[in-house]
């Protein structure tokens, strides 16, 4: 069933532009309360957290108005990462955790991610229930009763408890870390404060960039989707690695001192290979359709089962839970480690990478996965472009360029108004040539149909 509001990762779009108007968020709050908080023994305790966008606190207040129609007890963690909300929701027995964020998007966009009492993102069925209630409230011309509500401030508690959790529950070698310099790109986002604190306490020598959010500079020419400046910063700091997070802190990309970009596939490879050397069990790994084929080959060679899902960390998580696996992730840098966390976590993933890369280095093994050449191309389109035009274009392009010598994924993004093309082959020339041909074909097709 196609959803009207929820995408690959929650609800996301430009704030105050339909459908994400102020009234929508009030309706959303009421719909959440009426659809997800009616079960027996529910105490209606809600936890909010947000990233640094200028609209985030306003959205928290709007959703709270709707939630308060069902007399909820609402706590506000302030600016904090998505994984920290997942952790704190479960630890402190909230019924729901709600993150106001648009992840790696620029500041004009915003949205929400919702976690259940166990710290997992709500199910597709839950999303359908919320959407159905929103439509019902719209049809009933629902008017929110003005009422006073209190937001209980838990911002200091969550930062303290999350920091302790990261440092106590992850593999660390503090004595070895003392000589390791790191450059942190904090994306002017949710980890701008706690990220620096955790890496310092873990024993690293840290230099931070993009740690001065102003409400409008989140992910702006920085963070895990913009690595252009990081190599120069690493060189200036004489760092071993640059750790680049996204705006809400649930994904990470790493750059080493030789300018090698280590994405989610490299991070998974390093963790798995380090675990094997360390005589730790790896039951299986979950990736997505975008995961580089080289990782699949390596895992099979080691006798480790590998499963692919659709793009989206929720799909990865579902498959991990179904198969009892602890490790999974996306090329984009969402790394899931269920023995530590219920959500992708940039800080935990980076700490794990650093621990296992040290083990590999001591055994004179490279942390870099020798990948098949791969290229991802994004074609952006206007928000009002009809869904059927997009679907027809993707279908026809996928059929036209089907080729036994390459792996091709063409899909509509679940988080942005764009079509993503992934071309992978053994030969780099084929990848470049086919990427250009497919891009030109899709652009011409969209122009002709719209």
Question: Where are the model-predicted features located?
Answer:
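Glycine-rich phosphate-binding loop
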Residues: 95-109, 234-256, 260-261, 306-345
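Phosphate-binding and adjacent anionic-ligand microenvironments
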Residues: 277-450
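An N-terminal, well-structured beta->alpha segment
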Residues: 1-65, 69-71, 96, 152-182, ...
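N-terminal small/polar loop signature for handling phosphorylated ligands or for N-terminal nucleophile
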Residues: 34, 42-109, 197-255
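Active-site nucleophile and cofactor-binding loops and adjacent substrate-binding regions
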Residues: 74-83, 261-264, 288, 309-310
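Gly/Ser/Thr-enriched, mixed-charge loops and adjacent short helices
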Residues: 1, 14, 110-234
